Amino acid sequence: MEIIIISGRSGAGKSVALRALEDTGYYCVDNIPLDLLPQLTDILSQSQSSVAISLDIRNIPSSANSLEQTLSTLQKHHQIKIIFLEADRATLIRRYSDSRRLHPLSLKDLSLEAAIDEEYRYLEPLIQHANLILDTTHLSTHILAERLREFLRDNSEKELKIIVESFGFKYGIPLDADYVFDVRFLPNPHWDPTLRPMTGLEAPVAEFLNSHTEVNEFIYLTRHYIDTWLPMLEKNNRSYLTIAIGCTGGKHRSVYIAQQLGEYFQAKGKTVQIQHKSLERNKKI
């Protein structure tokens, strides 16, 4: 039986994710204690082929060993995938303020901020097992549902999807990144007044960066690093590999380098999605 476990931070969108999976045809179970999972899956396997189960902080044991043991038992008999939903701290605080709901750990007389931080510590062992980490900070419910459908399609095809994304450090590191490369030490087109309004997707900026040996060397060495370990990552039953390239504002250097890396792996026949987070963010503004 195929089992999708949905977990993540409270307020990150687990209920939306579970509804999206239900619409896709999964039999869904919301918030069952982890200890009851083996018994539940034994019963469901007699009548269901695809099940989605939501786990929140109230139903996850504080012991990492207990979590490991339960997941190991399930994996012996079923195909398990774990989807972990993330969002940045400020977004979670805003969502709780908007909904006027209590955080599950606020019942322990913690402030909302303290409850969010403590929850993250509890959930850390589960993050280590996640097949997909989705940062919902800037995702609408519609896009979140589409990302989940993409994951399920890619999962059925058993092909690793590479996401190469540029970002600006001043906006924060993407929470869903598997690898983060900092390119702030490279020559910056920002200091050229004619290049400043442009982006790393435009020819004059690309020509400026391509003219510097250190930029080309960085791209070559980064490609070589990923090429070296990609075969092992593909064998590791992953569905997504997210590579984040960051510069100060996410407008010039990171955009150019992310585009170069993404196009390189596309040319090698890999399934690649190129995203420019800070450019998309500024478009919305």
Curated annotation (Swiss-Prot):
Highest taxon in the source lineage: Bacteria
Gene3D superfamilies (UniProt xref): P-loop containing nucleotide triphosphate hydrolases
Binding residues for GTP: D56, I57, R58, N59
InterPro entries: P-loop_NTPase (IPR027417), RapZ-like (IPR005337), RapZ-like_N (IPR053930), RapZ_C (IPR053931)
Entry GO MF terms: ATP binding; GTP binding
Entry-linked Pfam families: PapZ_C, RapZ-like_N
Positions annotated to bind ATP: G8, R9, S10, G11, A12, G13, K14, S15
Signal peptide extent: none
Keywords for this protein: ATP-binding, GTP-binding, Nucleotide-binding
HAMAP family reported in the protein's UniProt record: RapZ_like
Protein's name in the database: Nucleotide-binding protein NTHI1314
